[in-house]
């Protein structure tokens, strides 16, 4: 799937955050945190890239919960597609991972499409998969350990248009040159770490 040559902020004039994660991961803490990010970047938008995003009930609920958190519901956008969704990542500048249960496949998809993902790392496996993906893609700095750092990292990335443009152009090649995109290398590292833990 082709990546757009520039992130959408270049043509739209505002940063678009977004998610393609499963709605069951949209906890109260998750929505709270996303709302803080949107308030920290006042001209930004947030897009839901999900099959459910075409349903009027989903749209109404999403707008309501953000409005309750002092975010103008007009800033919330929806792309309701099933199946051929990868091209629509071209409408997203930065993916905001769900929390505490993070993405896995969706994080890889976003990175493949040149969209950096900010994630919050927790103690359990469901809270660390994106951390593994980002670290093995060469972007460990986007995996943070507090909500405050999550917001600060997202806001700083939104303000750095040069980096957004660079990542849009280079992320796919970064994946190919890092363990996440090199199966044999990843497996070697994984088994070496497993052996280290088993011998500890």
Predicted regions and their residues:
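Conserved catalytic-core segment of nucleotide-activated headgroup transferases in glycan assembly
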Residues: 1-83
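Extracellular/periplasmic ectodomains of large secreted or surface enzymes and adhesion receptors
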Residues: 1-12, 158, 162, 192, ...
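C-terminal alpha-helical cap of glycosyltransferases
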Residues: 182-200
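Conserved beta-propeller blade repeats
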Residues: 84-88
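A structural motif in glycosyltransferase catalytic domains
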Residues: 30-34, 150, 190
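Catalytic binding pocket for nucleotide-activated donors in carbohydrate/polymer assembly enzymes
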Residues: 89-90, 94, 98-183
